[in-house]
């Protein structure tokens, strides 16, 4: 019986082919069109920022990698198919008219080019798309250098592990995938074209099929042998369950490492055995070789190390692992910047008795005790400084420091008054208003962290609110800048609040009369036209069409508010802008505003990281940086594993024009040096950091939190003690009853621990508990001062000194404290909130805990229930101090005179936006006497501090009259501030300035 001819495929009509072609073109356009639009938009955006070289370098690298890998993988797969086709048998018997292989063969032969070129091309393109995402690894291989440090096992420079080994592993994985796909393609090709037949008793295999398949299997085994070679080096950075450190341990060095070499030799022997089938024509030999390799990997690769671990290491693990633990301790300290050159350990009693005079003598700490919690006072900022419904402050504010008129260092709670488009209402929300009228924020607000306005002895009194210094656009467009530093341009076009909305773009530029809302006076609303250099021009129809497509908004094409001078501001988040121009950086989760050279800039910390530093502990950024503040706002770091981190870059983003500037902070970092070769001229040297900017650089929070988590273990020098964990520390939990995670570190101005002198320094601090206990083990401080920046001081504390939880429990359960707060919060009239519990070294060797207490109306968290400071609680050596002010609490705790150098509250009638008037001739305002508290006798008022040998001075008649004018001017300024009239506010501010001048001139 003859074989039935195969059925022909039905032909499509011309109309059907056209429709299918149009549909495919539409699909391709929908898939690729947005990519081209985004690419061109990014081209314009990077060019406007001055970082187009970054865009082109990344794009070119991705394209080259895509093309190379696509062609390589596609060619290898094509070769497997082509060889199977070209060496196919001339005659292939069939199993009858219903032979499925024959039908498939006929279909493939009818569309040979489609299958022969289409399948390899598809696989190659997919491989290229995946491979181009590894452009970072490739660039580091091409530009990486040496660390100047060798690993303790193989003696190789660490640059090999950081830059070379990841690339070799990447190449190996792609060669393995390509060879395996070629094997599958060749196998299927031979089966389809008759080189392999499964019919009959034993089947059939042509010589060509045998040679090709055996060769590919042999290549796979050789690649596996090379993988065993690379595995040896990766042992130095791997983790294994049950091992208390990262890197190769006793079992790895004495069992796994030799096993890798044995398996390598077996793999080479097996590869030779497989290749022998080319000549010997016996497939049993390669089959035996493959089985031998599999069995060897189980017995030698897994069984032997398991036996060594169970019977040699575990019975005496501390001694067996001690050498390798020492390696891990040294490597982890080096990788995370915790070496002896950076970290200084000092013994500190922690519970030394202190007299009132000793506490008062510690002026650098007691005069700067922080009572404002930046995570609580944001609603108060909103209530007093918001101004308009569309201005907004973040939920958590920032800490920074400035010097006052006398040159004293003070810490401030700072915030930029940004625009929040989500708070626009009614007709403010239409496209024109949202994107062309309400375009920017206005103002930099700072509050001294160590004082408040007035005293709130009673919840109904007007006191306890922050003292605001508001630098804003005032009457007639003049900038009102009372401090903490002079500011010329308070308008804010770039910031995290502005960017935290969908479609955060603004259209600015000169196009007729000014359109952007700026301020109001008692007559009219005054508008503004953006004059900054930032923004992508959209004056021509091409760019307007481009952005209309990008944002799916037709108003770009039809609105007359866009003219030839118009520009668009977008991508306005400072951290996102830094990550875009430096895609190799990991940025800190917090950015903060600062006044630098009379401009508002956002400061962003950038990290270079590695995940394969030999013997260094592998750490999760998201876990190590999580604390109660981050959890409260759901702001966690990337879930990224690192074993090396450096704060290599400090970046600034101009809040007005969006300019991004990158500075090299750690010029010795080999990873940074590699990226500076990849992107030359994009990072400025450290020497170009201006002194003004240097004064506002903070030791970054995320780095500090990672370091304290590691220092909890890696402060231990002895490997046996390390293994036992007996001397480990813990990061304490936040004792605040509303918290649910670790206690965050706190920025404070206090005694300089880095220099160990009596000067004040801005530092980031954290207490450390004993392992799984609530007693203190250490106190950690990282300096942010320019002279000692990055120096970490650790005060090690012996004995049983109460930690944060025990201190807070003692405060909150104190009879006087609990009864007083119970009265304030009775019947849900006020919500009591505990502020951050600060730990401060004071006196000859003690630790003072300070917790501000806030009250707000009602029990909700709404912004309208703005909190104010109602009490200050302290704890020192099992004693509790309590009162309405820092001075009262110090006096209650240590006795009269302890408050002599503490900062008192500002006048209660202090107007918004103005600093507290200083008492004449250096006199300090006396603290008010606290009321008769339950369970505690009234505290006597402290004596006035003499300004000189003759004691406190009396005001002259002229001086007293001038002081009265100052108070009247302050009252007028407060009324103007409350009215919201910027014109009256400016006039009142001028009257206050004149009154202050007359006061200073009076005799």
Curated annotation (Swiss-Prot):
Keywords: Cell membrane, Membrane, Transmembrane, Transmembrane helix. It is found in: Cell membrane. Residues 902-937 have a biased composition (Low complexity). The keyword Transmembrane applies. GO terms for cellular component: extracellular region; plasma membrane. Pfam families: UPF0182 (PF03699). Its main location: membrane. It is a multi-pass membrane protein. InterPro entries: UPF0182. Residues 902-979 are annotated as: Disordered. The chain crosses the membrane at residues 18-38, 63-83, 114-134, 176-196, 211-231, 260-280, 288-308. HAMAP family: UPF0182 (MF_01600). Belongs to the UPF0182 family. This is UPF0182 protein Mkms_1433.
């Amino acid at each position: 019986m003859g074989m039935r001819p195969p059925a022909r495929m039905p032909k499509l009509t011309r109309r059907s082919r056209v429709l299918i072609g149009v549909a495919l073109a539409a699909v391709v356009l929908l898939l690729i069109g947005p990519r081209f639009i985004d690419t061109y938009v990014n081209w314009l955006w990077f060019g406007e920022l001055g970082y187009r070289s970054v865009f082109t370098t990344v794009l070119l690298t991705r394209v080259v990698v895509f093309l190379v890998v696509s062609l390589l993988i596609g060619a290898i797969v094509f070769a497997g198919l082509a060889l199977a086709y070209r060496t196919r048998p001339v005659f292939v018997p069939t199993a009858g008219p219903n032979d499925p292989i024959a039908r498939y063969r006929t279909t493939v032969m009818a569309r040979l080019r489609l299958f022969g070129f289409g399948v390899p091309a598809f696989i190659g393109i997919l491989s290229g798309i995946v491979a181009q995402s590894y452009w970072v690894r490739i660039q580091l291989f091409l530009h990486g250098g040496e660390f100047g440090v060798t690993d303790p096992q193989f003696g190789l420079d660490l640059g090999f592990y950081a830059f070379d080994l990841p690339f070799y592993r990447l190449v190996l994985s792609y060669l393995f995938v390509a060879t395996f796909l070629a094997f599958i393609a060749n196998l299927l090709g031979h089966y389809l074209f008759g080189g392999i037949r499964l019919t009959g008793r034993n089947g059939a295999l042509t010589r060509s099929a045998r040679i090709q398949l055996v060769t590919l299997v042999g290549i796979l085994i050789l690649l596996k042998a090379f993988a065993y070679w690379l595995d040896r080096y990766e042992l130095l950075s791997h983790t294994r369950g049950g091992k208390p450190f990262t890197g190769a341990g006793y079992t790895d060095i004495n069992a796994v490492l030799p096993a890798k070499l044995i398996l390598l030799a077996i793999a080479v022997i097996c590869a030779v055995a497989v290749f022998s089938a080319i000549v010997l024509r016996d497939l049993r030999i390669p089959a035996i070789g493959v089985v031998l390799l599999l069995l060897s990997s189980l017995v030698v690769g897994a069984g032997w190390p398991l036996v060594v671990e169970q019977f040699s290491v575990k019975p005496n693990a501390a001694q067996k692992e001690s050498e390798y633990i020492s390696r891990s301790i040294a490597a982890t300290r080096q990788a995370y910047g915790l070496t002896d050159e950076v970290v200084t350990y000092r013994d500190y009693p922690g519970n030394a008795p202190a007299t009132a005079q000793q506490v008062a003598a510690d002026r650098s700490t007691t005069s700067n005790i922080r009572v404002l919690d930046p995570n609580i006072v944001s609603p108060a900022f909103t209530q007093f400084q918001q101004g308009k419904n569309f201005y907004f402050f973040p939920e958590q504010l920032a800490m920074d420091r400035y010097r006052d008129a006398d040159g004293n260092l003070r810490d401030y709670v700072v915030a930029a008054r940004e625009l929040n488009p989500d708070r626009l209402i009614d007709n403010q929300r239409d496209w024109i208003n949202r994107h062309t009228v309400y375009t920017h924020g206005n103002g930099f607000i700072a509050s001294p962290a160590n004082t408040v306005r007035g005293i709130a002895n009673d919840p109904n009194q007007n006191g306890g609110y922050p003292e605001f210094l508001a630098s804003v656009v005032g009457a007639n467009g003049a900038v009102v800048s009372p401090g903490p530093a002079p500011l010329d341009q308070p308008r804010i076009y770039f910031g995290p609040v502005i960017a935290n909305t969908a479609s955060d773009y603004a259209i600015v530029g000169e196009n007729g009369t000014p359109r952007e809302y700026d301020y109001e006076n008692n007559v009219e609303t005054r508008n503004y036209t953006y004059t900054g250099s930032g923004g992508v021009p959209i004056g021509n129809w091409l760019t307007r069409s481009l952005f209309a497509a990008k944002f799916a908004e037709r108003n770009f094409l039809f609105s007359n508010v866009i003219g030839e001078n118009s520009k668009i501001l977008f991508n306005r988040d400072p951290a996102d802008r830094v990550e875009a121009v430096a895609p190799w950086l990991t940025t800190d989760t917090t950015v903060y505003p600062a006044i630098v050279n009379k401009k508002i800039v956002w400061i962003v910390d950038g990290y270079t990281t590695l995940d394969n530093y030999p013997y260094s502990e592998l750490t999760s950024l998201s876990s190590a940086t999580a604390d109660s503040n981050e959890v409260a706002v759901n702001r966690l770091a990337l879930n990224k594993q690192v074993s090396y981190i450096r704060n290599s870059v400090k970046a600034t983003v101009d809040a007005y024009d969006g300019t991004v500037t990158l500075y090299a902070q750690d010029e010795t970092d080999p990873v940074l040096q590699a990226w500076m070769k990849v992107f030359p001229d994009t990072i400025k040297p450290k020497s170009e950091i201006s002194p003004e900017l240097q004064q506002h650089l903070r030791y970054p929070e995320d780095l500090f939190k990672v370091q304290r988590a590691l220092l909890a273990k890696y402060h231990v020098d002895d490997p046996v003690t390390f293994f036992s964990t007996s001397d480990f520390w813990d990061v304490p939990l936040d004792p605040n009853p509303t918290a649910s995670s670790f206690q965050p570190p706190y920025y404070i101005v206090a005694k300089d621990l880095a220099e160990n002198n009596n000067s004040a320094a801005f530092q980031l601090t954290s207490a450390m508990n004993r392992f799984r206990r609530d007693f203190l083990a250490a106190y950690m401080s990282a300096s942010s001062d320019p002279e000692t920046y990055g120096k970490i001081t650790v005060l090690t504390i012996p004995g049983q000194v109460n930690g944060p939880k025990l201190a807070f429990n003692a405060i909150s359960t104190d009879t006087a404290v609990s009864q007083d707060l119970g009265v304030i919060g009775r019947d849900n009239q006020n919500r009591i909130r505990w502020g951050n519990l600060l730990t401060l070294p004071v006196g000859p060797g003690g630790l003072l805990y300070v917790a501000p207490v806030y009250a707000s109306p009602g029990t909700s968290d709404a912004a309208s229930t703005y909190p104010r400071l109602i009490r200050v609680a302290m704890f020192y050596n099992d004693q509790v101090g309590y009162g309405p002010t820092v001075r009262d609490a110090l006096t209650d705790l240590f006795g009269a005179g302890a408050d002599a150098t503490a900062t008192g509250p500002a006048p209660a009638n202090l107007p918004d936006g103005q600093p507290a008037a200083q008492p004449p001739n250096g006199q300090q305002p006396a603290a008010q006497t606290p009321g008769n508290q339950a369970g505690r006798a009234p505290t006597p008022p402290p004596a006035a501090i003499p300004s000189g040998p003759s004691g406190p001075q009396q005001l002259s008649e002229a001086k007293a009259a001038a002081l009265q004018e100052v108070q009247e001017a302050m009252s007028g300024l407060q009324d103007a501030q409350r009215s919201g009239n910027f014109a009256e506010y400016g006039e009142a501010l001028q009257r206050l300035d004149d009154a202050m001048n007359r006061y200073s001139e009076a005799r």
